[in-house]
C-alpha cells in the first residue's frame, strides 16, 4: 500500500502590533489631499482660494489698509518682506529715475509725459523721506487666502474681499491655473513660490501700513 504523504503545515507567526507613532505639527495641520481647480482648491472639508496683491496706491492717508480683511472670518493675510541692500536700493532709484526721464521726453504721447513727470515727483519725495527718516526700501509680497464651507460662500467672500481692496486702491490677481503655487505661498509652513513676480519695492512705512493692525504711526 502506498504511504500517505503528510503535508507540512506552516504555522503563521502572529505579527507584532506596531507601536502608535506620535504625530508631529505638520501631520496635524496638513490635509491628506488637496484638489486644485482653475480658481480655487478643495482642502479637507473646505473650499479655498488665494489672491495675490499686484498694485498699490501711490499715496494714501489711510492707516492699516488691510485691517478690514483681518477682521473677517475665513480670511488669512500672509506678508513676505525682505530688506534691500544699499547697492540694490541705489540701483532701483537710479533705474526709476532714468525710465521716467526718458518717458517725460516722449513727443508721441502727452499722457505718458505727464505720468512720467508725476512719477519723478514721487521719486523725489521718496528720496527726501528716506533721507529724513533713515527709512529703508523693502521687497514686499502679499497673499490672501480665503476659506468657506461651499463654492457659493467662497465666491461671495471673494467678491466682498475684492470690493474692500478696490476701496483701498489695491489690485489683486486671482491666480487662475496657479492655485497650487498660491496654496504653497499662503501656507503657514510654505514659501513665496512666485519669487519676485508679485514683489513690490516699498518704503518701510508703507509695508508696515499693510499689516492688518490699526496704529497711530507714533512710537508711543
State the predicted function of each range.
Residues 218-220:
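Glycine-rich phosphate-binding loop of nucleotide-binding enzymes
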Residues 1-216:
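Extended, folded cores of ATP/NTP-driven motor/assembly subunits in large transport
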